[in-house]
Amino acid sequence: MGRLSPGLLLAGLFLAGCAQTAPLSHTATLTQPDMRPDTLADAEELCALVRTDYAFYESRRNIWEAACADLPEKVGPVMNQAEQLQVLETLLDALHDPHASFGTNSGISPRLVPSGADYWLTGNQVVAVRQGSAAAQAGLKVGDRVIAINGRPLDEAMETRLQPKGVAYDAAQKAWALNAAAAGYRNEPRSVTVARMGGPDTLSLENYSVAEPQELVTADMLPGRIGYIRLNNSLGEDATVAAFDAAMDQLKGARAWILDLRDTPGGGNTDVAEPILGHFLGETTGYQRVLPMDEPAWVKQASPHGGWKAEGTVVVLVGRWTGSMGEGLAIGFDGARRGDVFGSDMARLAGGVEEYTLSHTGFPIRLPAYSLAHVYGTPRHEWTPPHQVTADNGDGPDLALQAALAWLGEFSM
């Protein structure tokens, strides 16, 4: 696969996009030696690793080589682990890839996107606000026009994440940097300033209590015998398979189904996702294309699961917080022709990740090492739901669910 062996991780490594990571110390002592040599060695190692193992290197070759050039001149004294990680995080920013991330953090680390974000921007316009988030509670609305992030004008906010400095940035880099800046840093108070009728309105995103669902899966029989199941960021939990099985049994007899994947920013794994899809299959079916860097492409299969097949029409709800394996499950339902997907563009996390450990710092890192695609060939991160509707409407009405219910009502006539 490349020059580092995947899988040599520190205990407690998180799934891509998850918020929980092992924190590092950021307090240097008087006797702390200069950690620059180890940091520089791992920066060079990361540069080489991306060249050999990163699935999207060719599309980012120029910007990555610019970031890796003259590293000894760019790395100053490093006195603690937080500063070590900061050097490597800044280097990794050059990839402008939210699916490439470290498996640890410090108090000065950037928050991850999408799991650490609670609103999404296209240009200066808010296109999604995460339900129940601090942004939703603060009053941020889909359609708001943002004029500052954390007190900085948008161009200045983007500059905090654009790397390397002194080069020209394309539209994709700027779009990534804008949403990364909106997620902010762990040590930085967050706010967003929007243009309102009465003038600029700065909304603080601090000191809000955000409730986390306690159940892996939420299930309910909606009027009209529509079985509704929502995954609560649980595609990486082995226990989700049994919880989903129980939810299906609870809703047995539903005439139609809604599978809500709008809260899956942390991704997950196929051992959980395939049994979920399998409940709705009558035979083994291809659901996702895998495109390794150095092997022929092949199609991932899912098999029937659960002892009985769920009949009836299926709607899958997705949005900006549908990430990684959540995206794979959405394109799987579409590719298997077993579900109609409603919502907005998803998190657009490209490829499938492998896990590595850098040799000198021991920091775990995850990089997309192979591409993934819809069975019909569209790269997963470029695929768009056929039924477009606002998926993440903050504290407003659930427009995607309303659209799904209306469509299912028409379908039954």
Predicted regions and their residues:
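Solvent-exposed loop/turn segments at secondary-structure junctions
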Residues: 132-134, 153-154, 210-212, 233-237, ...
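Low-complexity, Gly/Ser/Thr/Pro-rich intrinsically disordered linker/tail segments
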Residues: 388-413
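Gly/Ser/Thr-rich loop/hinge elements
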Residues: 265-317, 321, 351-362, 369-375, ...
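Loop/turn elements at helix/coil->beta-strand transitions in domains of secreted/extracellular proteins
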Residues: 225, 253-257, 311-314, 337-340
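Positively charged n-region of N-terminal signal peptides that target proteins for export
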Residues: 1-4
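Short, well-structured beta-strand/strand-turn elements
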Residues: 99, 337-350
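Bacterial N-terminal signal peptides
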Residues: 7-17
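Flexible, low-complexity junctional segments that flank or bridge functional domains
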Residues: 19-256, 263-265, 356, 364, ...
